[in-house]
Amino acid sequence: MSRSLYNWLYRDTLSSRGRTALLFGGVVILVAAVVGGTWYYFHAKAVEKEEQARRAALVLQQKRTSIHNFYTTALKGADVRGFLALYTEILRSRQPIELAGFREDSFSCTTESCSFSYLAGQNTVFSVQDKYFRNVSYAPSFSQESVDYTGIPSGMSSNPVLEAFNRQEKISEPTCNDILNYVYSYNSLVEAGQRFTLTTLPASSVSADEEALPGNPDNHGLLAGKWQVSLPDNYVTVHAFWHNRPYSSSFIFQSVAGKQGILDISGTLLCKK
């Protein structure tokens, strides 16, 4: 009887202790889960915030890069002085080859390089000779009837506006209304063969980016269009056309090509909004 009572009491005690242990263990697990969940929540929030900041910084950097690339592309080229210096060298360098009996068929220059093609005359004794351009000699490639020179540096990749941009200095250009009024007025007064053609009106692909980054040093609020003009291939006409041209700093020269006595000149037109 006493042993049965003892066993019953002992069993009850063990059951109570077990329940206490289970309850304690459950509390510990619950607390751990709450703490772990809380840590995970705030850690996840911190990671998400860092990712948002990283993405925002990346977007801003992409905007800065877009602005920089827009201006370096639009501003790359020569100013009037640089273009006239290049054209003078083109005229000078063609003379020795023409004296040897070759006729310049065509040439073209970009902001990077120039190429020239010469045809042999009917009574020309075919001989290969180098082309001297800015006191540097360039060997040709040739066929039975022509002599070609390629890869000659044009020296037409820089100008004062681009240099000011690279120094992060202020760039002052006329308003688009002023320069467009000038171009249209000029075109109305001259023959069709000497008119400016605006192949692309001034615009900007980065205006919104500049507004989003008001303190960006590359911001200048400029618009860029494309112009083209055709002129006779002779120094007097070309020099007279560009000498003392109003708004000359707004004309960036990026290409010149000559064929059959005509020059096609083109580039970027700069102006303020």
Q: Predicted segment positions?
A:
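N-terminal positive-inside, membrane-proximal cytosolic segments immediately preceding the first
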Residues: 1-32, 37
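Generic signature of intrinsically disordered, low-complexity segments enriched in small/polar residues
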Residues: 9, 43-44, 73, 121
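N-terminal cleavable signal peptides for secretion/export
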Residues: 70-89
